[in-house]
């Protein structure tokens, strides 16, 4: 039942997600592509986590943060992708009011967590390049755990504000969301209550997370750039810069798409463009992060080769004996 009658009001109990397209052929094509992307996302990030756990060579702060970023990527993609895949297979995809709240809150949690972890990783690179002699002290195990716990708390607070904002909205009219997940903008358009408080709270929370993390990243890389430019050795410059390239790529992709959706005026892009960009930063980027961090990282590639070599060697011994 999509509507619940309560006195003079009719409350919406479920929403209809329109998804990406109505074309049946395109739905099958997109289902196949996004399913493959999701499987690569989960397997790639899980492989990253396991490789970091089992490789003693990767037991460093940078990889500790990377393993949590991989976990956040799995959660972020999983908050919307399974429901999107179902949308491709059914004629009309519905999501309950509570389900919509959970989806919106989980996306806000993992999105906020990803922002904080990217900022923490930038700070880690700053300490490693600008204060290498104090690195072991400033990035001790206790400090690393505190930074990660703080990131999870930040993500939880962002999700709490988002969920409370959603629960303050009242829906009594149309229940069709022109999106593939419960995003805030289309929900605001459907609400028949005063949305000013919800918009203010959500904007404050998301804006604070974004501005705070961008500030940390910008300051960290400003000092990193100054330090690199002061280096006399060309080899030292190249080595220092190469350690930051992967992280800068991930930051640029993630914050670039967020800026397109939430900062640019809506008059400059259509709803369909919004959907495409949302797919990119919620589905594609979580798949790309393991590739970005591993392809240019010799330590990860070396650890992977060692473990694959051990596995192949052990299997050959079993076959031999």
From Swiss-Prot:
It is found in: Cell membrane. GO terms for biological process: G protein-coupled receptor signaling pathway; sensory perception of smell. It is a multi-pass membrane protein. The chain crosses the membrane at residues 29-49, 58-78, 103-123, 137-157, 200-220, 241-261, 275-295. Residues 1-28, 79-102, 158-199, 262-274 are extracellular. Potential odorant receptor. This is Olfactory receptor 5P60. It comes from Mus musculus.
């Amino acid at each position: 039942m999509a509507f619940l009658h309560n006195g003079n009001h009719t409350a919406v109990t479920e929403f209809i997600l329109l998804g990406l397209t109505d074309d049946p052929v395109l739905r099958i094509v997109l289902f196949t592509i996004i399913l493959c992307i999701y499987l690569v996302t989960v397997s790639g990030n899980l492989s990253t986590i396991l490789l970091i756990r089992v490789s003693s060579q990767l037991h460093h702060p940078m990889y500790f943060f990377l393993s949590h970023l991989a976990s956040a990527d799995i959660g972020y993609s999983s908050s919307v992708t399974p429901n999107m895949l179902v949308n491709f297979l059914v004629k009309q995809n519905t999501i309950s009011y509570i389900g919509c709240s959970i989806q919106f809150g989980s996306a806000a949690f993992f999105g906020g967590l990803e922002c904080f972890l990217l900022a923490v990783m930038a700070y880690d690179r700053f300490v490693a390049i600008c204060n290498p002699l104090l690195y072991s002290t400033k990035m001790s195990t206790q400090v690393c755990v505190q930074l990660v716990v703080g990131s999870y708390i930040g993500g939880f607070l962002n999700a709490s504000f988002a969920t409370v904002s959603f629960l303050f909205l009242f829906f009594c009219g149309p229940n069709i969301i022109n999106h593939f997940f419960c995003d805030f903008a289309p929900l605001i358009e459907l609400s028949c209550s005063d949305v000013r408080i919800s918009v203010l709270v959500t904007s404050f929370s998301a804006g604070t997370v974004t501005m705070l993390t961008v500030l940390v990243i910008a300051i960290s890389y400003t000092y990193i750039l100054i330090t690199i430019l002061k280096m006399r050795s060309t080899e030292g410059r190249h080595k220092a810069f190469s350690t930051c390239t992967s992280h800068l790529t991930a930051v640029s992709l993630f914050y670039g798409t967020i800026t397109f959706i939430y900062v640019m005026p809506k008059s400059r892009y259509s709803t369909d463009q919004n959907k495409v960009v949302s797919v990119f930063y919620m589905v594609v980027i979580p798949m790309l992060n393991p590739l970005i961090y591993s392809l240019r990282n010799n330590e990860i590639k070396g650890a992977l080769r060692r473990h694959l070599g051990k596995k192949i060697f052990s299997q050959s011994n079993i076959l031999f004996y």
